[in-house]
């Protein structure tokens, strides 16, 4: 039997981290089993579904490289198929037309609630033989079994049982002729030969209804696995106040897809004590019986730690391809300065996100108009004039511009003036970067370049002279 899973989001908003984890688990299970992964867009909610949301879902899937083997299928393009199946069910007696008015149903609901009963349809039209005109408005309901129970072996939670008495004769076609969500899902899973339905635990109550419809159709019943919810670190349901919840917001905030995938896979699944997983390792080790039944807590600090890890362990050339987008967002012209892969090596230890890297790298490529006030006040003082002049001359004299030779020039300046390295290094750092912090000074000066470094030292000397004249 070929294993087939699916990810079936509703395009009413962005791809959130809970949906992304569900997609990842479905994708990993299919890949682990040598099966296929289907993308299906469940867009039957015509009022809330938007093209922008569809695009956002596709963008998120593509950014995470969760490639699909089939699809994307759209439910709105399959209405003829759904209605054909409903007509077959009407003919077979497994579905029936219901003409009850909204007023009657509301009165029934209020009566049941007043008695402390669970609100459900009473089956009036199921047993009615009244004649109705062909054009009289009606819904179509599924004739749910009225005895026995539905038992399914959840691949994460174990056996789950529902009494059929607890289940309603749910509506499968509305008065406007449109099929409902629970019905469309069933026909899709049947037609697409889905073998494993991996989805959030909020769908558990839908499962017995869908199983009963599948059985009424004589269709095979897939295996189900319901993944627990993701909470914030305070134990409450994950929301925007816990940080970003959209996958693409994490891209915008400077996270690598590898970091988010690694974080999401561990958010409810484990393989021993291992924390870091490559994509290949995720595929190799993933198993549904290792997925936790308990809710997971989203920890942004852990995700940030993983992101920093991947910035420093993935190939700099690869990280640079993701950094490029952030550089463009900051409108930095990188034609004059280090290659982005080199920049990743320079700033990787200091920066935990690519956004932070893009926001702190401008001095490598563009001249700055002023020095950081605190750094200049502390380090660009008259006492710094001589160290800056001497190191400028030594840097200017270098014929082989390497980081090692830059280091020797700084060291030689300190030795010549008989001062500590800090007396040379700190004024030089402020002079060439405009700030009081940077990566190692030798690699920073080397990356900025000889002529630009000398120009900036001269600018710092002019700043010191101007400050002296004002005193």
Curated annotation (Swiss-Prot):
Describe how the cofactor binds. Binds 1 zinc ion per subunit.
Q: Which one of the record's GO molecular function terms can you name? A: zinc ion binding
Q: What is its EC number?
A: 6.1.1.17
**Where do we find the motif 'KMSKS' region here?**
237-241
State the similarity comment. Answer: Belongs to the class-I aminoacyl-tRNA synthetase family. Glutamate--tRNA ligase type 1 subfamily.
Q: Which NCBIfam families match?
A: gltX_bact
Quaternary context: Monomer.
Would you tell me the protein name for this molecule? Glutamate--tRNA ligase
Q: What organism is recorded for this protein?
A: Cronobacter sakazakii (strain ATCC BAA-894) (Enterobacter sakazakii)
Q: From which lineage does this chain's organism come? A: Bacteria, Pseudomonadati, Pseudomonadota, Gammaproteobacteria, Enterobacterales
């Amino acid at each position: 039997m070929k294993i087939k899973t699916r990810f079936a989001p509703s395009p009413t908003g962005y791809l959130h981290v809970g949906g992304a984890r569900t997609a990842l688990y479905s994708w990993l299970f299919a890949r682990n089993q040598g099966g296929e992964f289907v993308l299906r867009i469940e867009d039957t909610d015509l009022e809330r579904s938007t093209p922008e949301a569809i695009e956002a879902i596709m963008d998120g899937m593509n950014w995470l490289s969760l490639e699909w083997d089939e699809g994307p299928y759209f439910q709105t393009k399959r209405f003829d198929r759904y209605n054909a199946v409903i007509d077959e069910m009407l003919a077979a007696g497994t579905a029936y037309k219901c003409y009850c008015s909204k007023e009657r149903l509301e009165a029934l609901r209020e009566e049941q609630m007043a008695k402390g009963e669970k609100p459900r349809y009473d089956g009036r039209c199921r047993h009615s033989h009244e004649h109705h005109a062909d054009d009289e408005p009606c819904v179509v309901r599924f004739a749910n079994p009225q005895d026995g129970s539905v038992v399914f072996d959840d691949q994460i939670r174990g056996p789950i049982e529902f009494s059929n008495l607890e289940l309603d004769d749910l509506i499968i076609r509305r008065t406007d002729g449109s099929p409902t969500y629970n019905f469309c899902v069933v026909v899709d899973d049947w037609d697409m030969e889905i073998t494993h339905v991996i989805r959030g635990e909020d769908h558990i109550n839908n499962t017995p209804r869908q199983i009963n419809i599948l059985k009424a159709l004589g269709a095979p019943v897939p295996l189900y696995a319901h993944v627990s919810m993701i909470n914030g670190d305070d134990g409450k349901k994950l929301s925007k106040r816990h940080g970003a919840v959209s996958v693409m917001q994490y891209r915008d905030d400077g996270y690598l897809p590898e970091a988010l995938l690694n974080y999401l896979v561990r958010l409810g699944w484990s393989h021993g004590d291992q924390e870091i997983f490559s994509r290949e390792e995720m595929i190799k080790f993933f198993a549904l019986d290792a997925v936790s039944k308990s809710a997971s807590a989203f920890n942004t600090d852990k995700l940030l730690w993983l992101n920093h890890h991947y910035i420093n362990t993935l190939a700099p050339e690869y990280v640079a391809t993701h950094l490029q987008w952030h550089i463009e967002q900051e409108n930095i012209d990188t034609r004059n300065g280090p290659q982005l892969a080199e920049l990743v090596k320079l700033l990787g230890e200091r920066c935990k996100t690519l956004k932070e890297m893009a926001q702190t790298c401008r001095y490598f490529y563009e001249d700055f108009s002023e020095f950081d006030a605190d750094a200049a006040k502390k380090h660009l003082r008259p006492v710094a004039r001589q160290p800056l002049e001497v190191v400028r001359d030594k840097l200017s004299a270098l014929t082989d511009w390497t980081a090692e030779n830059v280091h020797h020039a700084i060291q030689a300046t300190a030795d010549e003036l008989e001062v500590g390295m800090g007396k040379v290094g700190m004024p030089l750092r402020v002079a060439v970067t405009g700030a009081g912090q940077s990566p190692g000074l030798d690699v920073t000066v080397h990356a900025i370049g000889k002529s630009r470094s000398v120009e900036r030292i001269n600018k710092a000397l002019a700043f010191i002279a101007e400050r002296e004249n004002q005193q």
